[in-house]
UniProtKB/Swiss-Prot annotation:
Its main location: cytoplasm. It comes from the Eukaryota. Pfam families: Vel1p (PF10339). InterPro entries: Vel1-like. GO terms for cellular component: cytosol. It comes from Schizosaccharomyces pombe (strain 972 / ATCC 24843). It is found in: Cytoplasm, Cytosol. Residues 1-16 form the signal peptide. Belongs to the VEL1 family. Keywords: Cytoplasm, Signal, Zinc. The keyword Manganese does not apply. Transmembrane segments: none annotated. This is VEL1-related protein SPBPB2B2.15.
Amino acid sequence: MFKNLIFLFFIGLATAIRFNLTDLECSRLRGPHCGTYLLKVVGTNATYVGEKSFIGLDALTESKGEFFQRMLEQEPRLIPRLFTIAENDTANFTPLTFTTYLKTCNPQSIENAMIPFVNTVTSEISFDAWAYTAQNSSRITGLSNQLMNSTLYNVQVATCTPGFSALLLDSPTINVFNNEEGMPSWCQPIELTPVCPLDEGFN
């Protein structure tokens, strides 16, 4: 039992370390100013990194007043979200606007500044309220730069199915693997590139 705990600890540690990036430049960011961009899947016309959402059972079983109050408080758990890729006109899908710190151009936040996490066992990326309390979760820093420059930072970016959340929302998850890891058969490698929201028709 003790050996298993040590093994799991080192797996989690190794996974967490690869997300600690510093001194990153924004030479590939082509937003209106340094650090406002969308991540587009290379080789597609309108497929972006974004989120799909659904209303949880607890929200459906409470009164309208309680639901509205939780919505005003922007409670993340009220409407769980899946970090995924999809075409812009997909139902319940919203492309995410990534931002960076203007002075250094290092990644600062994703959309509404929620902190992304990675599952150290499945390598699935998530940033909803459940990710923080989920077992095997590890905080990510420098996520957007790794997604854009995966080969430079020795990681593989992939979309994966099946999975409970992927089946529920009919969308793949986004996972990050070390280059030396074998990718599961249910995953497909993808390449992402930053694009200016205005150039893509977003206001």
